[in-house]
């Protein structure tokens, strides 16, 4: 590609990570990543997705257990990451999945941009009535 810039390089170099250091990320790092999520494009500018950051080990373990029960597996969907950011889309919003997906994209790029590993965990997707 003949055009090079910081954004295109970040997009091209981002990779999924499935092995994490046990050290917790800093509040500043978490804020940087989630702020990028809030800047994601959304249909009609609704900004409807909600991000929930989970750093408590017991809560992460419970979320992992619940996911394993739904998926019929015992593996940790978060690969031992000390932080998980759940992105929730509105069930009745016809663009909810797309809006949440755009937020996820921003989260992944922001994490990569500041040197953090990240991975889209689609297995956590669960529709409830």
Map each language-model feature to its residues.
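Charged helix-capping and loop-helix junction motifs
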Residues: 101-103
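Short hydrophobic alpha-helices that are characteristic scaffold elements of the AMP-binding
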Residues: 109-113
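Glycine-rich phosphate/pyrophosphate-binding loops
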Residues: 114-123
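Active-site-flanking beta-strand signature of metal-NTP-handling nucleotidyl enzymes
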Residues: 84-88
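Short pre-catalytic strand/loop immediately N-terminal to key active-site residues, enriched for Gly-Thr
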Residues: 92-98
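N-terminal amphipathic, basic helical "cap/leader" segment at the start of enzyme domains
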Residues: 1-83
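Short, histidine-centered active-site or binding-site loop motifs used for metal coordination
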Residues: 15, 89-91
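Conserved small/polar residues in nucleotide/adenosyl-binding loops
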Residues: 127-128
């Amino acid at each position: 590609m003949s055009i090079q810039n910081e954004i295109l390089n970040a997009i091209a170099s981002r990779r999924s990570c499935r092995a994490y250091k046990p050290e917790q990320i800093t509040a500043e790092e978490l804020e940087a990543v989630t702020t990028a999520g809030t800047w994601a494009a959304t249909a009609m500018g609704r900004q409807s997705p909600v991000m929930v950051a989970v750093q408590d080990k017991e809560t992460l373990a419970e979320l992992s257990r619940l996911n394993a029960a739904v998926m019929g597996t015992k593996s940790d969907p978060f690969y031992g990451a000390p932080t998980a950011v759940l992105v929730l889309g509105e069930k009745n919003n016809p663009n909810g999945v797309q809006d949440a997906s755009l937020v996820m994209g921003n989260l992944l790029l922001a994490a990569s941009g500041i040197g953090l590993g990240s991975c889209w965990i689609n297995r956590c997707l669960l529709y409830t009535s």
